[in-house]
A protein has these predicted regions:
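Phosphate/NTP-binding elements of NTP-utilizing enzymes
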Residues: 1-300, 312-322, 333, 340, ...
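Short, solvent-exposed loop/turn segments at secondary-structure boundaries
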Residues: 325-327
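Short coil/turn segments at the loop-to-beta-strand junctions that recur within blades
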Residues: 329-331
């Protein structure tokens, strides 16, 4: 009877943890989550949700990988049913980055929990339940730098479960195709599924930007900031240092926006022009007499591998023209198209 009561109490506690990830973190890891961590974790609790999407857009140094690791343990420990076990995949911008950051954090936080240490086995490529090693796991995944969407899809395959989840770290520069591949976990009518990602807002062309801006209506977006004026700022970044950087460079400085405020710079972290500036240039129109004898210049971008298209663009003086895309896998044929474009426009240079 004593053993049955113990099992019953354990099940009750896990059910409570499933609904309250914040309490799970307190009980298992002995930590008091920061204000932004509470907001993020609460989005992963409550009633069952077959399509959870959480994105954490972070300044530098707030502990986002540690938070992502705790969320991973919450999914592993608390989401299971009779004959149904959680299956997860973890992915970062590179295999080495995953190994050195998120995967190391998973090991660190497991070591702080006697419950997780007893129930799960951590290895370099896989974390699994000791009693169900084949069906209850979180595996480390990776993809080649030049991988196309099909290859990325294979990197995130094999998560057939009622409780699938995917952890994505450093998504600032991660290809948007990763997001589309990850969303496959929602297609099997799961009981509760989650994609959880975190990254720094250094690029306006990666998965993080797409999730926070273009597809923000699909995601719970948490902005993690070191802004001294924000009551929910991370306490893990010195307020004095943050204020000094703001005073020195200004709030609209791209570096300050990305690394201190947790915001996307208008032109990206390392971009000469922002997307808004390019769009504005494309919408301008000049008459021929305003362009005078301006040279006709063509520019080309060859998509040698991956899921992108090649492109060719015409410019005459200050006038930019619509970009023509070419979905041609053979680079020799792309070169022939470029030659034909130069002749068609009587271009002065390519």
């Amino acid at each position: 009877m004593a053993k049955a009561e113990t099992v019953s109490k354990a099940r009750e506690r896990i059910r409570a943890w499933r609904r309250d990830p914040v309490q799970f973190a307190r009980d298992c890891f002995g930590v008091e989550p920061d204000a932004w961590q509470v907001d993020a974790m609460r989005s992963l609790g409550g009633d069952p949700n077959p399509a959870r999407r959480l994105v954490m857009k972070a300044c530098t140094g707030p502990g986002k990988s540690a938070t992502l690791a705790r969320m991973g343990w919450h999914r592993l420990a608390c989401f299971a049913g009779k004959g149904e076990h959680p299956k997860g995949a973890a992915l970062s911008i590179t295999a080495d980055n995953l190994k050195d950051n998120l995967w190391a954090e998973l090991a660190k936080w497991q070591a702080r929990s006697p419950f997780l240490t007893e129930a799960f086995q951590w290895t370099k490529e896989r974390i699994y339940a000791k009693e169900h090693p084949e069906t209850w796991f979180l595996s480390a995944r990776s993809f080649a730098k030049d991988a196309d969407s099909e290859s990325i899809g294979r990197a995130l395959s094999g998560l057939h479960s009622q409780y699938p989840f995917i952890l994505l770290d450093e998504t600032g520069d991660m290809p948007t195709a990763v997001g589309r591949a990850a969303a496959q976990i929602f297609t099997g009518s799961p009981a509760d599924a989650a994609i959880i990602q975190a990254g720094n807002p250094t690029s306006t062309s990666g998965l993080l930007y797409e999730s926070c801006m273009t597809a923000a209506h699909q995601w719970t977006v948490i902005t993690i900031t070191a802004d001294p004026n924000d009551p929910k700022r991370t306490p893990r970044v010195s307020k004095e240092h943050a204020q000094e950087m703001i005073d020195t460079y200004g709030r609209d400085n791209p570096w300050v926006m990305a690394t201190i405020l947790g915001l996307f710079p208008p032109g990206g972290f390392n971009s000469l022009f922002g997307a808004d500036e390019v769009d504005a240039a494309m919408k301008r129109f000049y008459r021929d007499d305003q362009l005078g004898n301006a040279a006709v210049i063509l520019g080309g971008d060859v998509a040698r591998q991956g899921d992108d298209s090649s492109a060719v663009c015409k410019r005459r003086g200050r006038q930019a023209y619509p970009i023509r895309t070419l979905r041609i896998p053979d680079t020799t044929l792309v070169a022939q198209q470029f030659v034909q474009e130069k002749a068609r426009h009587d271009a002065d240079a390519f």
